[in-house]
Amino acid sequence: MIHTLRVSAVIPFYGEPEPVLAIIDSLRAQQGIDPADIEIVVSDDVSPTPFPDVEGVTVVRRPVNGGFGKAVNSGVDAATGKWVFILNSDLELDNTFVSRMLAAVERHGEVLASPQIIGHDGKQQWVARKFPTAAHVAWEWFTPLARFKPTNWWHRGVGHDVEACTGTADAKVDWVMGACMVVPRATFNRIGGMDERFYMNSEEVDFQYRLSNAGVDRYLIPSVTVTHEGGGSSPSERRVQWLTTARFIYADKWGWEKKLANLLRVTSYVNFLVNSVRGLRNKDVDARGFLATELERIAKAERREN
């Protein structure tokens, strides 16, 4: 009888190898499951520093850089385990992470699930979220509301599932952030994997929306936690453009791009009015410059520029 591995850990890689090598060490030190039952796949997305060959690790070397979704798909293509653990390269795992996540997903059946994710600042990263709408994006785009980020009111406005994120019981949610996801490999392939039109951001939202349409539930498992660095190595403005463009691709795919573009432009002009008033008291506030930057982000997103 051919033995089917229980777990394939798929790690998209771009950057420095050290954090991924630390994850590999953590996976090999897992308790509650035979480490030999954990297959490790690293998907090197043409990193400037190539990932080294490591004994017992499958390294997929992609021919061209394609972003998170393509790297995940390439990694899952090489995987053989029943459950795929999609792990960001900047995670820190404790030594019972795999066994506890397996127990949770096997309890719920054919699902996609994420643990609770904590940043190095000790704060949760709002893993569970509602499927995005134009109003959610505009709420985040409206800069005068930024001062309210510490409030649950603001988090609800941008689509965070406050009840799930602050609860202690397993919660069925719309979608979970993609830093640490567990899903059956057969389900991943049946749904068609990640949509490779997304370069960075929103591919996990789209994937889970398709899971929802197929009747596959998504769960947050708050009893299991991982630590996540977050942010990546790219400049902040570039990350903002990646996110904006990805949101436009998602909105176009699901039929509300025009609504999103119009609402963000209106919000940008409201931001301009608020910043103009602020500029009367603070000469460092460049209302016209902020407006130009926001309108250019929207235009680039419509042109699908990253």
Task: Describe each model-derived feature in a short phrase.
Residues 62-79:
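Glycine-rich, basic loop-to-helix element that forms the pyrophosphate-binding segment
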Residues 238-248, 252-306:
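Non-catalytic, C-terminal membrane-associated alpha-helical segments of glycosyltransferases
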Residues 84:
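Short aromatic/hydrophobic "clamp" motif used to bind/position activated sugar donors
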Residues 26, 33, 42-52, 64, ...:
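A conserved acidic beta->alpha catalytic loop
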Residues 16-30:
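Short, well-formed alpha-helical segments that are part of the catalytic scaffolds
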